[in-house]
Amino acid sequence: MIIEAAQVISNEAAWAGTNLMWLQSPGLAANVSPGQFLMVHCSAEGADPMFSRAFSYCRVDGDRFAILYSVVGRGTAWLSERQRGDLVRCYGPLGNGCRLPDEPGNLLLVGGGVGVAPLVALAERAVGLGHQVVAMMGARTEAHLLPAHHWPKEVEYVFVTEDGSAGPKGFVTHHLGKYQEWASKIYACGPNPMFQSLADVLRNNGRRQHPEILMEENMPCGWGMCYGCAVFTKHGVRLCCKDGPRFNLFDVF
């Protein structure tokens, strides 16, 4: 784990109410596995809020990395005001990232909302290792979708919106269709209702492969000290920050 002040490179809207921030830090960008996260202190030195915020690595490029965040409270409002050259205190990388198959295969990535973030990093790594990747993303409206240029060009980008403004109408887990049979491995990140829906769909279709999910829980500390991110699994209580955020879908849902 590295504790370092990262320098803001850019901080721009990805979609309404959600920003993509690029930061520079050789230490924080080194040896990152897709699915890992870092803690970002979203205030000036010693100011409120006290607890850091957890953000997944969305992209990593050399000594730079990007995070995707929604502006929903004091901390992220402060973060949204940072400009190029500002310093932001962070520590990471933390958690257990995704495991990619040794042999190239067909990978289906399922995401919703800001849950898209670690899946972009996963797609970049997977494409580089020769995997075929389909990214199926769900959003409320077309305006809430991550623009296609953020994905590697080799990725097939499929989107679903709840209002039907782009792609099929409904929830992303209800439109997996042919991709369920095509996929040799499934990864997902998003809210818990999406995970539950994904588990139900796969069970109903007799697909008992074991998708890896990246859970989104409030993680005040990031290393297992506060027990604020407990996840109840069939193997007992686990901590999202320390034991996750990668879990087996059917161990939790």
Role assignments for model-derived ranges:
Residues 2-84:
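Ferredoxin-reductase
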Residues 45-55, 95-102, 241:
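Short, Lys/Arg- and Gly-enriched loop/turn segments at beta-strand edges
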Residues 74-218:
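FNR/FR-type flavoprotein reductase catalytic core
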Residues 172, 237, 249-253:
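A charged, well-structured terminal subsegment
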Residues 201, 223-224, 245-253:
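Nucleotide-activated chemistry modules centered on ATP-dependent adenylation/adenylyltransferase
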Residues 216-245:
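Local cysteine-cluster metal-coordination motifs and their immediate loop/turn environment
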